[in-house]
């Protein structure tokens, strides 16, 4: 006689970008094992494959394509799936800012971690009086690379590559140039032709992009100094 099947609980959350309700379930043991083994390998390709596989399996709402979600939606979703799977309280060790060496243990409730939206954030960038650029958020692959890439590389080249993948289109009143129709070399040359002011506007897009963020207060047990620490991005909470 076959063994009975264990009922898996389901949960709902709202995607920060659209407010759309998404049903999901926790990791199963086999999926958690897959993630742990991938993280222990410190191999970015293995981690990418594992996170993609787990997110696709755990998201139950039809029509949700994980690969197309904004980075901050992916972070928020992954954090909550992990919370329902291994515990909704995260235990971290924070280095006190005042002496930069003393570690303090803290506990954070997953529900207290929000995606912060900056009012100055914009996906539209004015390059000159006639030309505009529209940016898009990093892909799932870029998200994983930024959070879990253990390989040292040329930071400048990586930055240019990231920016290039986030340019959706360049347009004016008469024409639209979609970067999907361009080569990486053409996009890179276009970026290199910008002046400093234009490039700073692109940097501002990334600096103000919605992100997981949580502010905590820590007191250094040695100096008794209380400091505020801002934790940003999934990697800060992935301990």
What are the functions of these language-model segments?
Residues 1-239:
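Long C-terminal interaction/binding lobes of large macromolecular proteins
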């Amino acid at each position: 006689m076959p063994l009975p099947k264990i009922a898996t609980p389901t949960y709902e959350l709202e995607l920060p970008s659209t407010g759309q309700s998404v049903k999901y379930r926790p990791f199963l043991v086999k999926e958690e094992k897959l993630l742990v083994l991938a993280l222990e390998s410190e191999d970015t390709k293995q981690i990418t494959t594992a996170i993609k596989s787990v997110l696709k399996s755990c998201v139950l709402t039809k029509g949700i394509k994980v690969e197309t979600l904004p980075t901050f939606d992916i972070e928020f979703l992954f954090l909550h799936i992990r919370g329902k799977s291994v515990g909704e309280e995260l235990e971290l060790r924070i280095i006190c800012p005042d002496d930069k060496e003393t570690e303090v243990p803290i506990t954070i409730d997953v529900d207290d971690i929000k995606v912060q939206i900056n009012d100055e954030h914009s996906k539209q960038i004015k390059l000159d009086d006639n030309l505009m650029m529209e940016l898009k958020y990093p892909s799932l692959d870029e998200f994983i690379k930024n959070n879990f890439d253990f390989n040292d590389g040329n930071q400048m080249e990586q930055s240019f590559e990231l920016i290039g993948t986030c340019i959706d289109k360049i347009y004016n009143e008469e024409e639209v140039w979609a970067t999907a129709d361009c080569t990486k070399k053409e996009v890179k040359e276009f970026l290199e032709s910008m002046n400093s002011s234009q490039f700073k506007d692109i940097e501002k897009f990334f600096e103000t992009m919605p992100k997981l963020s949580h502010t905590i207060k820590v007191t250094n047990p040695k100096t008794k100094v209380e400091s505020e620490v801002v934790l940003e991005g999934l990697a800060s909470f992935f301990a």
